[in-house]
Every structure is written in structure tokens, then in C-alpha cells.
């Protein structure tokens, strides 16, 4: 039995939850998110919390138990506080700028790379840092990964685009002519 699934989800003030036939709609001060309902679980809405219960004792329903609780909790956190990921652009001449909903990266290619942000995602550039913000945790993570993939950090000098908290494993360079006679 999932220990995460057993925990009740607290609903903060200002969040409105609607249970539909196949979806759960969460409306908050920042956005409105929709998450799919699982038929293997039952959802109980009591005052300021939601309690999930497992209807069957199958392997699949137990796997969905903790997952659906976490997805629902992430939606509630997203519509109240929001999520953000910060990327660092490291390298000589590497630059990042945001113009509207387009992120422009100059990261060593012969041309600048333009990435259009989807609806619900905003970006802010401060020097060598790019912060991606939004209410959908999955979409924020996907956009950060897509931007990082343009120029991954290389292990010799550490140049590239990395997450703020990421530690790059560095490699030693060439040994410089040892062993030649």
C-alpha cells in the first residue's frame, strides 16, 4: 500500500476543485489545470481536503494510488504558487534573452536559436540565468529540458546550458606529451 497515497491533500483558500466524469478541474488564482481521473481510485472531497482511496487490491491500482495523489497535489500547488526552473548559460560569448514568448539563445552556433514558449509558460532572463515559470510542473520541466538540450554542458570546460543546481562532472584534459621519446 502506498504511503504517499494515504496522505490527504490539503486545499488552500482560493482553490476551487470540480470533479467531472473523467477529469478533475482545479481552479486557482494563477491558472486552471485539468488532471485525468483514475477509475481504480475513489476521490472524496471533505471541507478543505481530498482523500484518495484504493478500490481494488491489484498491482496497477496500487501503482496509480501514489501517482494520482502526487499529480493532484502538484496541480493544487501549481495554481497557487506555481513552479520554476532556473538554467545557467556558461561560456564566453554565450547569451540568453527573452522577447515576448520567444527565448533567444546565442550558444556558439553560427545562428541564434529561437524557442517559442507554449501557453502558460513564461521566462525571465537575468544575465546568464534563464528562469522558466508556469503552473504546470510537467510543462515547466519539459521546456527546461528542451532548452538545455540545445547545448548540453561539456565535461572539459563546463560550457553549455545547465540547471542551476546541476553539478557537472569534469574530466581531465590531455596529458600533454607524456611518454614520447
Curated annotation (Swiss-Prot):
Pfam families, alphabetized: Ribosomal_L6
Organism: Lawsonia intracellularis (strain PHE/MN1-00)
Gene: rplF
Record's protein name: Large ribosomal subunit protein uL6
PROSITE patterns recorded: RIBOSOMAL_L6_1 (PS00525)
Example of a GO MF term: structural constituent of ribosome
GO CC, any one term: cytosolic large ribosomal subunit
Homology family: Belongs to the universal ribosomal protein uL6 family.
SUPFAM superfamilies: Ribosomal protein L6
Keywords: Ribonucleoprotein, Ribosomal protein, RNA-binding, rRNA-binding
Assembly and interaction partners: Part of the 50S ribosomal subunit.
Known function: This protein binds to the 23S rRNA, and is important in its secondary structure. It is located near the subunit interface in the base of the L7/L12 stalk, and near the tRNA binding site of the peptidyltransferase center.
Stored InterPro entries: Ribosomal_uL6-like, Ribosomal_uL6-like_a/b-dom_sf, Ribosomal_uL6_a/b-dom, Ribosomal_uL6_bac-type, Ribosomal_uL6_CS
GO annotation, biological process: cytoplasmic translation
PANTHER family associated with the record: 60S/50S RIBOSOMAL PROTEIN L6/L9, LARGE RIBOSOMAL SUBUNIT PROTEIN UL6M
Keyword Ribosomal protein among UniProt keywords: yes
Amino acid at each position: 500500500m502506498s504511503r504517499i497515497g494515504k496522505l490527504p491533500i490539503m486545499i488552500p483558500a482560493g482553490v476551487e476543485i470540480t470533479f467531472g466524469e473523467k477529469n478533475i478541474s482545479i481552479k486557482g488564482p494563477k491558472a486552471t489545470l485539468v488532471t485525468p481521473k483514475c477509475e481504480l481510485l475513489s476521490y472524496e472531497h471533505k471541507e478543505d481536503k481530498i482523500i484518495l482511496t484504493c478500490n481494488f487490491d491489484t498491482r496497477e491500482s496500487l501503482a496509480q494510488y501514489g501517482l494520482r495523489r502526487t499529480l493532484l497535489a502538484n496541480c493544487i500547488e501549481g495554481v497557487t504558487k506555481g513552479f520554476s526552473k532556473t538554467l545557467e548559460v556558461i561560456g564566453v560569448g554565450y547569451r540568453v534573452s527573452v522577447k515576448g514568448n520567444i527565448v533567444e539563445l546565442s550558444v556558439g552556433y553560427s545562428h541564434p536559436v529561437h524557442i517559442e514558449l507554449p501557453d502558460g509558460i513564461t521566462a525571465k532572463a537575468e544575465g546568464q540565468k534563464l528562469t522558466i515559470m508556469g503552473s504546470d510542473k510537467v510543462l515547466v520541466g519539459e521546456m527546461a529540458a528542451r532548452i538545455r538540450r540545445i547545448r548540453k554542458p561539456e565535461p572539459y570546460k563546463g560550457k553549455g546550458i545547465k540547471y542551476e543546481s546541476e553539478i557537472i562532472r569534469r574530466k581531465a584534459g590531455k596529458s600533454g606529451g607524456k611518454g614520447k621519446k
